[in-house]
Regions:
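Feature marking long nucleic-acid-engaging regions of large polymerase/nuclease enzymes
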Residues: 1-165, 221-230
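Gly/Pro-rich turn-and-neighbor structural signature
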Residues: 165-226
Length: 230
């Protein structure tokens, strides 16, 4: 779901105008557009009087696919899925549908979005490789700086300026700060890392997608793999 809702930030100009979800699916099959390509298409829903209405939007192909499985209700807007959908955001979408459409429509929606998610997760082929774990360039400098500071604490302790307990607390504190800084630097680099494929597709780092979406893993686990221990 996260992958489907991603947006190509550099893609400013729409790559086509489509009058139906079938046309979008055909274009995806032909590879004339990608899931993350900006396009112009329509969102069919109903108004407060129960009459069918058609709204035009500029968004990604993936988000139009997500909008297609939304229940028809005047309170369920296209904006509900017109954003990057993390695990938390998907929960909010389900909650909104439950409040306005009831249990039956919510169950149907969950089943549809599950099928859509599995289908495109399979097609995306997102995997976990060692090259996806990016060690921050600043790691060595941060660690060496921390070690120098610890040497200073050792000197202060030897000179009787601080107690053993104070030295211990200072060492723990500075290693904790170093760990957090390395983790933040790693997340900054991994979030901007991209893969460019032979067909000119540009994909976000797989490990970052897994953690940021809330599907699997966390920043703390990534910190251990590519930050302090890795």
């Amino acid at each position: 779901i996260y992958y489907l809702s991603q947006d190509e930030e550099n893609d400013k100009k729409p790559k086509g105008i489509f009058s139906s979800i079938e046309e979008i699916e055909q274009a995806l099959e032909d590879k004339s557009i990608s899931l993350h390509s900006k396009i112009v298409s329509i969102f069919k829903t109903i108004n407060s009087e129960g009459k069918s209405v058609t709204e035009k939007y500029t968004s990604t192909a993936g988000r139009f696919l997500l909008a297609n499985v939304l229940p028809k209700n005047h309170n369920i807007k296209f904006s509900l899925v017109n954003k990057l959908l993390t695990k938390k955001n998907v929960s909010e979408v389900i909650d909104t549908i439950f409040r306005y459409c009831g249990q039956k429509e919510t169950v149907i929606f969950c089943d549809r979005i599950k099928t859509l998610g599995f289908k495109h997760a399979f097609k995306a082929g997102i995997s976990f490789g060692k090259d996806d774990l990016i060690i921050p360039k600043t790691k060595e400098n941060l660690i060496s700086g921390t070690k120098k500071q610890i040497e200073e604490y050792e000197k202060q302790y030897a000179d009787g300026l601080i107690t053993r307990g104070e030295k211990y607390n200072k060492v723990v504190d500075i290693w904790s700060k170093c760990t957090d800084t390395v983790a933040n630097e790693m997340m900054k680099e991994i979030s901007s890392a991209e893969k460019i494929y032979d067909d000119d597709r540009i994909e976000t780092n797989s490990v970052y997608m897994m953690a940021d979406s809330g599907a699997r893993g966390s920043q703390a686990q990534m910190k251990q793999l590519a930050g302090m221990r890795g």
